[in-house]
Amino acid sequence: MKFGNSRNFEQCYNLQAAVDTDTMLIVGTYPTRNCNDKMEIKKCVESISEEVKRNKKVFVCADTGYFSGDLIEKTEKEHPKVKVICATERVGHGRTVEQIFEKLPAELPEEKAGEAMTTEKMRARLRTGKGQEIYSKRKTTVEPAFGIIKRVMGFRQFLMRGLENIGIEWDSVTISYNLSRMHSLKSLALAKE
């Protein structure tokens, strides 16, 4: 797999996790050998448990690497309660004065059934208040979960080999993360009482 923006290739796996924005619990996981995330959005949605998708509308926020119009369109057709919010290009961190005071539409735009997912359609989703609200949660939801797994739990490399074994080990790591997170949520709930 190509490592970062360098010319180096390393033999490694790409770990995927779907994290709930409200609880920060990991609700779906799987490893892959694909070097980038371009073809992963459908698999990621399918890794989310059916109980989560059945009970409410699911918004999936993903960074630029996941954007593939055809795959997003296919995913949304197969999973009608799922709406993908995905950046189409890298955007700088700073905002201009015009961008700060720009009036954005409040809700996601209406889309006709059967219409192809294009870069422009995804940009239109992101240029709404709801789209920006959902997308802004991405970096404060998924990144902390991976940070806790790596820094707090000390998980940096796999002990097993092979995609199936890596999947089992990754599931074990995310289960232990979820148990720790549920304990924290329980403590917070008791403190509020």
Each language-model region and where it sits:
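Anion-binding and metal-coordination hotspots
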Residues: 1-193
